[in-house]
């Protein structure tokens, strides 16, 4: 029998509607969105629904991931949306009996891999990722960028703008 591995993507692969078919089809996925929303109600959304509704800021995981909004591409929100979607799909696969022998993730995806490995409780993972997104947004506000340059240092200096 073949070995199965789960691979989780990092930030950058998000889009409005990601995971919606899973959410609308499988109770296991819906439960993950509800759990994430419950954790965030206590941590961030708190009792701000009216203020957030007026400002346009998302006040539920469903609104953030399924309704058209600019926040899906803002790190503060992107990370919790990605993890919620990853864990929702993971729970559906597990309910169908598809168990992985290993899991790996790129950057943010490492937390999806932690969920797959069962090493942390989901509410804790949601709290950690929500705060990670906030801190990363504060450290690198909108408009920042990153690049990876492979090669000798002497070449790197020649290719970077001064």
Regions found by a protein language model. Give the residues of each.
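Gly/Ala-rich beta-loop-alpha elbow adjacent to hydrolase catalytic centers
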Residues: 105, 109
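Helix-rich "cap/lid" substructures immediately adjacent to catalytic or cofactor-binding pockets
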Residues: 2-104
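Alpha/beta catalytic cores of group-transfer enzymes, especially the acyltransferase/condensing modules
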Residues: 11, 38-56, 116-158
């Amino acid at each position: 029998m073949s070995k199965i591995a789960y691979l989780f993507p990092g930030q950058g692969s998000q889009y409005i509607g990601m995971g919606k078919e899973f959410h609308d089809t499988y109770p296991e996925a819906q439960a993950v969105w509800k759990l994430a929303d419950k954790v965030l109600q206590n941590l961030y959304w708190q009792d701000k629904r009216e203020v957030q509704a007026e400002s346009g800021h998302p006040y539920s995981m469903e609104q953030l991931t399924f309704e058209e909004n600019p926040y899906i591409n803002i790190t503060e929100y992107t990370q919790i949306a990605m993890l919620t979607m990853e864990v929702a799909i993971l729970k559906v696969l597990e309910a169908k009996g598809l168990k992985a022998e290993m899991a790996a993730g790129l950057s943010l995806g490492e937390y999806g891999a932690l969920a797959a490995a069962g090493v942390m409780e989901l509410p804790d993972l949601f709290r950690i990722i929500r705060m990670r997104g906030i801190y990363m947004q504060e450290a690198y506000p909108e408009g920042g960028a990153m690049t990876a340059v492979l090669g000798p240092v002497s070449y790197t200096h020649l290719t970077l703008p001064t």
